[in-house]
Regions:
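Beta-propeller fold detector
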Residues: 2-7, 50-54, 89-94, 132-139
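Helix-loop-helix "hinge/cap" segment bordering the ligand-binding cleft or interdomain interface
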Residues: 3, 43, 288-395, 471, ...
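Conserved N-terminal structural module of periplasmic/extracytoplasmic solute-binding proteins
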Residues: 19, 59-66, 70-76, 83-85, ...
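Beta->alpha turn/N-cap motifs
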Residues: 31, 73, 195-197, 253-258, ...
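Mature extracytoplasmic/periplasmic domains
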Residues: 128-133, 138-153, 167-170, 176-185, ...
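Conserved C-terminal helix/tail region of periplasmic/extracytoplasmic solute-binding proteins
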Residues: 165, 169, 513-586
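Hinge/lid segment of periplasmic solute-binding proteins
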Residues: 254-304, 314, 450-454
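Extracytoplasmic/periplasmic substrate-binding proteins
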Residues: 378-475
Length: 586
């Protein structure tokens, strides 16, 4: 036996994680050394070893024709390195739904690099720049958060074989092929439109497709257009043109869209036949009237305020409006803000319900003035000059579940019991987006139930994953059934697979799952002791979720906060632009 010394592998922490025989007879070894990856290329004929250290953790990695192809973990990029000197030859931005949390299934076959992830099956010709999306798995089995992709193989007949493990730990294998003779589904096509991808939507597509094999389900994402340079207004305007031309989708995820306008114009089908038992009735019926239920939220974010001290409890419990909170908000030891965007994001949802009434198109000028005046007073009192809190960025953090899914979740930046031990704040306001995260952040610093947990004045919540079915569709019944399936997907099993951008409307599901993890044995209160379900029952009013209106208000509010324009100019600009926006909706 002959040994080939490799200096990089002599380190104590070096861990070999991959070994392949390349087509040219060379041996390609991948090793993890600390937080980086080392690639070693060995020529058996000369016993020479070439070591390449890219400076990041790359996996999986492949060698072909003098180049190393490596996926950068924690990012959405693929790097091509010169195998002789490690120089970057090419870098690709991958069409991934989320950064690679673990090695995806990948292989080099037939002069192509192919890989499979939760977005689909993709390939790049070696030495080329053209990326091909061979299967959009946002509508297929690989989209399921419970399926862990492990390997992919392309056979000589053009079949892509993908293996992995499901939620039950059972091995599964799928074959993907393009069949020119395949019959079109007899039940037609059900088209679902959403601004953004989501775990709940993916789970529903897979569940519905398995229950209705006679029908094809297609999901269209507005985010794809945003990635191609369109603005939010452009995306919504294009969708509206399609809807009113009778060429729109069948099912809508209404988040960010003018849902109130759609209801007033009578273009949404009645969802009253969907069984909403065991749900928060105050949430699921927020868009219902005596004639029917026109939109159905499947998640929601409560607008909450909470505090540690008994002193602030008394003051907060008596607050009837935003003005009543102003003195408390202005004191940094009560509510800590370092970015005016974060302040706006925490208070706007509750205020929007008063500024833009659900019942009609128009602006409540008094409510608008109150919101702008109070938030401007906080900006001045706390001397906030930056747009974003340096600790929390734009107010969104990334939570990852055991399934590797990464989803944006809003974390109240004023709650600094956990984030700022050196400069704590007694109170917090915000729109917590996950039952688990709400519990963790409420008890993490003190290990006790807060002195007060209540809705912000107005008892407002933000509807999320609000579903609607267009009554102009020829698939109305199928669309209603799809929404019903979506509600049925809110189970403890799904709740345990990742974080969500809101609370389930199915009451008690997330509480039961979180309670299994935090049962009081660690000395902290149990989730049920927070009594959040009782707080949720107090919520009565949906916030205005129209993304165009929110951006319109924020753009002008930012000018006020930075001193570029005064209050009167800000109010006048918002009123003028809102009138134009509403006129366009007619």
């Amino acid at each position: 036996m002959q040994t080939i010394p490799v200096e990089a592998l002599s380190q104590e922490e070096a861990l070999p994680i991959g070994l392949r025989l390349a087509a040219d007879g060379k041996i390609f070894l991948t090793a993890q050394v600390g937080e980086t990856t080392v690639f070693v290329l060995v020529d058996p004929a000369t016993r020479q070893a070439t070591t390449v250290t890219p400076g990041f953790y790359g996996s999986p990695a492949f060698y072909a024709e003098g180049s190393i192809y490596t996926f950068a973990a924690g990012s959405t990029s693929l790097s091509v390195l010169d195998a002789t000197n490690g120089r970057v030859l090419q870098q690709y931005s991958l069409p991934l739904a989320e950064p690679l949390a673990r090695a995806s299934a990948a292989a080099i076959q037939q002069n192509c690099l192919i890989w499979a992830d939760s977005n689909g099956i993709h390939q790049i010709a070696l030495g080329g720049t053209l990326q091909q999306n061979l299967a959009d798995n946002r509508s297929f089995a690989l989209a399921s958060s419970s399926f862990i992709v492990q390997q992919i193989v392309l056979d000589g007949q053009g079949n892509y074989w993908v293996s992995g493990v499901n939620a039950g730990g059972q091995a599964q294998i799928y074959r993907y092929r393009y069949d020119t003779q395949a019959a079109v589904a007899s039940g037609g096509e059900l088209v679902v439109w959403a601004m953004e991808d989501s775990l709940l939507l993916r789970e529903t597509v897979n569940t519905y497709a398995s229950e209705h094999p006679e029908q094809t389900v297609t999901v269209e994402y507005g985010q794809d257009s945003l990635d191609n340079g369109m603005t939010v207004d452009d995306v919504i305007r294009t969708l509206n043109v399609e809807i009113f031309a009778g060429e729109g989708p069948d099912v809508l995820v209404l988040d960010g869209l003018p849902v109130e306008s759609y209801i007033r114009q009578g273009i949404l089908a009645d969802l009253s036949n969907i069984d909403t038992s065991n749900c928060y009735e105050n949430i699921v019926h927020c868009y219902a009237d005596e004639s029917g239920c026109w939109a159905l939220p499947l998640l929601f974010r409560p607008s909450l305020v909470y505090c540690q001290s008994e002193e602030n409890k008394a003051r907060l419990s008596e607050a009837q409006n935003l003005t009543d909170l102003q003195d408390l908000l202005c004191v940094k030891s009560n509510f800590h803000y370092d970015g005016y965007y974060n302040l706006f994001s925490e208070l706007y949802p509750a205020a929007s319900a008063s500024i833009f009434a659900v019942e009609g198109e128009g602006v409540n000028e008094d409510a608008l003035r109150e919101f702008l005046s109070v938030t401007k007073a906080v900006v001045d009192a706390q001397q906030i000059s930056a747009e974003y809190d340096p600790l929390f960025g734009d107010g969104e953090d990334t939570a990852s579940g055991d399934d590797g899914q990464h989803l944006a979740v809003d974390i109240p930046v004023s709650m600094n019991w956990y984030g700022r031990a050196q400069d704590p704040a007694d109170c917090a306001a915000g729109n917590p987006s996950d039952y688990l995260l709400t519990y963790i952040y409420m008890v993490s610093e003190t290990g006790s139930v807060p002195a007060l947990i209540r809705p912000l004045p107005g008892d407002v919540f933000t509807p999320v994953m609000t579903m609607g079915v267009l009554n102009t569709s020829d698939q109305v019944d199928a669309g209603v059934a799809f929404v019903g399936t979506m509600l049925d997907c809110e189970t403890e099993d799904l709740a345990g697979r990742g974080s969500f951008n809101g609370y389930f409307v199915r009451q008690g599901v997330q509480l039961a799952k979180v309670s299994q993890r935090y049962d009081g044995t660690d000395g902290n209160p149990t989730p049920s002791e927070l009594n959040l379900d009782a707080v949720m029952a107090q919520l009565t009013t949906p916030s205005n979720t129209d993304l165009s209106l929110r951006e319109l208000v924020y753009e002008n509010a930012a000018q006020l906060y930075t001193g570029v324009q005064d209050l009167e100019t800000t109010v006048a600009n918002i009123l003028q632009r809102t009138d134009l926006y509403y006129a366009e909706q007619q």
